[in-house]
Amino acid sequence: MTRPVLALDVDGVLNPSGSLSNLDPGCELHRIEIPACDVPDSPLVSGSGTRDLSTTVALNPSLHGAWITRLRGEYDVVWATTWEHTANTHLAPLLGIEPLPVGISVTTHPAYRGEDDDGIVSAWKARALSQAYPDRALVWIDDDNHAYATDPTWNTAHRWAAECDPRSGLTPAVMNRVETWLMHASRSM
């Protein structure tokens, strides 16, 4: 039996963008220094490969790290983020998780560069995930997939876009809905 796929974004999902006073008590702030050679070649990152990148992330290893580790026993959990392999190098250790496969990449989906279907920035991810996992049950958690979260042609019995509020990120309520969906999807495959 083929395992369902859980595709995770980072910024706005595992790394909420809300004010410090609104972050979950389990969030830990980390300053990350990424050498230029490790900066993903992404149109979202200025100076990719030429300048070091310094950023602060708020991660919750006790909530998200434990959840990801547990779900990996039954599902294929992959990165769906412009962090790509850098997420494994810099974020996975902070979350207390083993490295995850990179499910989609801006470098292998060139349609992303300069295109955004009708202003939908996450359209490249939707296309890339559909191409990468055409016959798999798939849940995609992102803070910028609103157009897909409400699209009945994208959300089917075997594919669902679960959205997060970027200010709070991945909450226990969203995690519970995702887990319920994954359980139903794995039974119906």
Task: Please report, for each region that a protein language model flagged, where it lies by residue.
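Short, low-complexity, intrinsically disordered N-terminal peptides in bacterial proteins
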Residues: M1-T2, M189
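Alpha-helical substrate-recognition element adjacent to the catalytic core
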Residues: T2-G114
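C-terminal cap/substrate-recognition subdomain and adjoining C-terminal extension
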Residues: T86-M189
